[in-house]
Regions:
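Terminal and domain-flanking low-complexity segments
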Residues: 2-4, 75, 111-152
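Compositionally biased, intrinsically disordered low-complexity segments
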Residues: 5-8, 17, 69, 90, ...
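Motif-centric detector for short Cys/His coordination patterns
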Residues: 46, 50, 67, 71, ...
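Alpha-helical transmembrane signal-anchor/signal-peptide segments
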Residues: 37-51
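Short low-complexity stretches enriched in small and charged residues
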Residues: 17-28, 45, 73-87
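Non-transmembrane, membrane-adjacent beta-strand/coil modules in membrane-associated proteins
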Residues: 52-63, 68-122
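Alpha-helical transmembrane spans
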Residues: 1-40
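Sterically constrained small-residue positions within well-ordered secondary structures
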Residues: 33-35, 42, 109-110, 119
């Protein structure tokens, strides 16, 4: 009788371990995947630009609505910058943010790059960048050229 009880306890213990593994493995995989998922693609069209963001809402801005555009370095490296709504992980920051420099603003940035294109669009600040400084400069030049043509 004691062997039967001991055997049932071992079976229950094994069943618990299997259940814990079934729960733990997907949780770990999801957590790791979530830390690195997402993407940001900026496409310049004739009259507007599109930000296609996997992990957050896409954004479309018209060149005619851009009041100012600038290329900035290390402008977001401040302790008071925080996300108020959006998506962020080890690679990307997307959504609505707030800091001492811009107040409330919209951001689509790669964590690997510390240069930014800052645009004032109808009174709202939009901050974007590429994966590196060269890609960010290219984004700035393309949008600046389109804004200049739109203003002529």
């Amino acid at each position: 009788m004691f062997r039967t009880i001991r055997k049932k306890k071992n079976e229950i213990s094994i069943n618990k371990s299997v259940i814990y593994l079934i729960i733990a493995i997907p949780t770990i995989v999801f957590t790791i995947w979530d830390l690195f998922c997402g993407s940001i693609q900026i496409r310049c069209n004739d009259r507007d630009f599109n930000i296609e963001a996997k992990g957050w809402n896409d954004y479309t801005g018209e060149y005619s609505q851009i009041d100012s555009i600038s290329y900035e370095v290390n402008v977001l490296q401040n302790d008071n910058d925080h996300r108020t709504n959006g998506f962020g992980n080890l690679k990307y920051a997307m959504g609505n943010f707030n800091n001492d420099i811009f107040g409330d603003y919209i951001r689509y940035t790669h964590a690997s790059c510390h240069s930014y294109v800052v645009m004032n669009i109808d009174g709202k600040i939009l901050v974007v960048n590429g994966e590196n400084d060269a890609e960010t400069k290219e984004i700035y030049q393309r949008i600046s050229e389109k804004v200049s043509k739109e203003r002529k």
